[in-house]
Amino acid sequence: MNARGASAFVLAKVFRGQSLSSALPPYAADINKSEKARLMDLCYGSLRWFPQIECYLQALLKKPLRPKDLEIKALLISGIYQLLNSETPAYAVVHDSVSAAESLGRPWARSLVNACLLYT
Protein backbone atom coordinates (compact mmCIF):
# COMPACT_ATOMS: atom_id res chain seq x y z
CA MET A 1 0.00 0.00 0.00
CA ASN A 2 1.26 3.48 -0.79
CA ALA A 3 1.13 6.57 1.43
CA ARG A 4 -1.96 8.00 -0.26
CA GLY A 5 -4.07 4.87 0.30
CA ALA A 6 -2.78 4.46 3.85
CA SER A 7 -3.59 8.09 4.65
CA ALA A 8 -7.18 7.54 3.50
CA PHE A 9 -7.57 4.63 5.92
CA VAL A 10 -5.90 6.52 8.79
CA LEU A 11 -7.97 9.68 8.28
CA ALA A 12 -11.19 7.65 8.01
CA LYS A 13 -10.41 6.05 11.37
CA VAL A 14 -9.83 9.50 12.87
CA PHE A 15 -13.15 10.73 11.41
CA ARG A 16 -14.82 7.76 13.11
CA GLY A 17 -13.42 8.86 16.48
CA GLN A 18 -10.09 7.07 16.86
CA SER A 19 -7.07 9.15 17.82
CA LEU A 20 -4.39 9.79 15.23
CA SER A 21 -1.70 8.49 17.57
CA SER A 22 -3.40 5.08 17.67
CA ALA A 23 -4.57 4.96 14.03
CA LEU A 24 -1.27 5.90 12.36
CA PRO A 25 1.32 3.37 13.65
CA PRO A 26 -0.17 0.18 12.12
CA TYR A 27 -0.22 1.76 8.65
CA ALA A 28 3.17 3.44 9.05
CA ALA A 29 4.70 0.05 9.86
CA ASP A 30 3.37 -1.44 6.60
CA ILE A 31 4.97 1.03 4.18
CA ASN A 32 8.59 1.68 3.29
CA LYS A 33 10.65 4.40 4.93
CA SER A 34 10.58 6.80 1.98
CA GLU A 35 6.76 6.78 2.01
CA LYS A 36 6.46 7.06 5.81
CA ALA A 37 7.31 10.77 5.85
CA ARG A 38 4.76 11.40 3.10
CA LEU A 39 2.11 9.45 5.05
CA MET A 40 2.74 11.49 8.19
CA ASP A 41 2.65 14.76 6.25
CA LEU A 42 -0.63 13.84 4.57
CA CYS A 43 -2.26 12.82 7.85
CA TYR A 44 -1.05 15.65 10.07
CA GLY A 45 -1.45 18.32 7.39
CA SER A 46 -4.91 17.19 6.35
CA LEU A 47 -6.10 17.26 9.95
CA ARG A 48 -4.48 20.62 10.61
CA TRP A 49 -6.29 22.23 7.67
CA PHE A 50 -9.41 20.04 7.91
CA PRO A 51 -12.01 22.78 8.64
CA GLN A 52 -10.97 24.88 5.65
CA ILE A 53 -10.58 21.89 3.33
CA GLU A 54 -13.95 20.44 4.36
CA CYS A 55 -15.71 23.73 3.52
CA TYR A 56 -13.98 23.75 0.16
CA LEU A 57 -14.93 20.11 -0.46
CA GLN A 58 -18.58 20.74 0.42
CA ALA A 59 -18.65 23.48 -2.21
CA LEU A 60 -17.29 21.03 -4.81
CA LEU A 61 -19.76 18.22 -4.10
CA LYS A 62 -23.36 18.41 -5.29
CA LYS A 63 -24.47 16.15 -2.43
CA PRO A 64 -22.59 14.86 0.61
CA LEU A 65 -20.85 11.50 0.53
CA ARG A 66 -22.50 8.60 2.33
CA PRO A 67 -21.17 7.81 5.82
CA LYS A 68 -19.80 4.48 4.59
CA ASP A 69 -17.59 6.34 2.09
CA LEU A 70 -15.36 8.04 4.67
CA GLU A 71 -12.25 6.63 2.97
CA ILE A 72 -13.16 8.53 -0.22
CA LYS A 73 -13.78 11.71 1.78
CA ALA A 74 -10.41 11.23 3.46
CA LEU A 75 -8.77 10.67 0.08
CA LEU A 76 -10.28 13.88 -1.25
CA ILE A 77 -9.24 15.84 1.83
CA SER A 78 -5.65 14.61 1.66
CA GLY A 79 -5.55 15.31 -2.08
CA ILE A 80 -6.83 18.86 -1.66
CA TYR A 81 -4.38 19.40 1.20
CA GLN A 82 -1.50 18.28 -0.98
CA LEU A 83 -2.62 20.41 -3.94
CA LEU A 84 -2.83 23.53 -1.79
CA ASN A 85 0.15 23.02 0.51
CA SER A 86 2.88 21.08 -1.25
CA GLU A 87 5.15 21.43 -4.20
CA THR A 88 4.10 18.10 -5.69
CA PRO A 89 2.89 18.68 -9.27
CA ALA A 90 -0.90 18.74 -9.55
CA TYR A 91 -0.98 16.02 -12.19
CA ALA A 92 0.88 13.66 -9.84
CA VAL A 93 -1.49 14.34 -6.94
CA VAL A 94 -4.54 13.77 -9.13
CA HIS A 95 -3.12 10.58 -10.67
CA ASP A 96 -2.10 9.12 -7.30
CA SER A 97 -5.48 9.95 -5.77
CA VAL A 98 -7.45 8.43 -8.65
CA SER A 99 -5.30 5.29 -8.46
CA ALA A 100 -5.81 5.13 -4.70
CA ALA A 101 -9.60 5.32 -5.12
CA GLU A 102 -9.45 2.16 -7.19
CA SER A 103 -7.07 0.43 -4.78
CA LEU A 104 -9.48 1.25 -1.92
CA GLY A 105 -12.03 -0.94 -3.67
CA ARG A 106 -14.18 1.94 -4.86
CA PRO A 107 -13.69 2.18 -8.64
CA TRP A 108 -16.88 4.24 -8.95
CA ALA A 109 -15.12 7.06 -7.07
CA ARG A 110 -12.34 7.51 -9.64
CA SER A 111 -14.29 10.06 -11.67
CA LEU A 112 -15.46 11.87 -8.52
CA VAL A 113 -11.91 12.16 -7.18
CA ASN A 114 -10.61 13.24 -10.58
CA ALA A 115 -13.26 15.96 -10.98
CA CYS A 116 -12.93 17.35 -7.45
CA LEU A 117 -9.15 17.55 -7.58
CA LEU A 118 -9.05 19.03 -11.08
CA TYR A 119 -11.31 21.87 -9.94
CA THR A 120 -9.02 22.57 -6.99
Protein language model features and the residues they cover:
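Σ70-family region 2.3-2.4 aromatic/basic alpha-helix that recognizes the −10 promoter
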Residues: 37-40, 108-115
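Short, flexible active-site-proximal loops enriched in glycine and acidic residues
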Residues: 66-73, 85-94, 107-112
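Conserved nucleotidyltransferase catalytic core and NTase-mimicking acidic/glycine-rich helix/loop elements
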Residues: 97
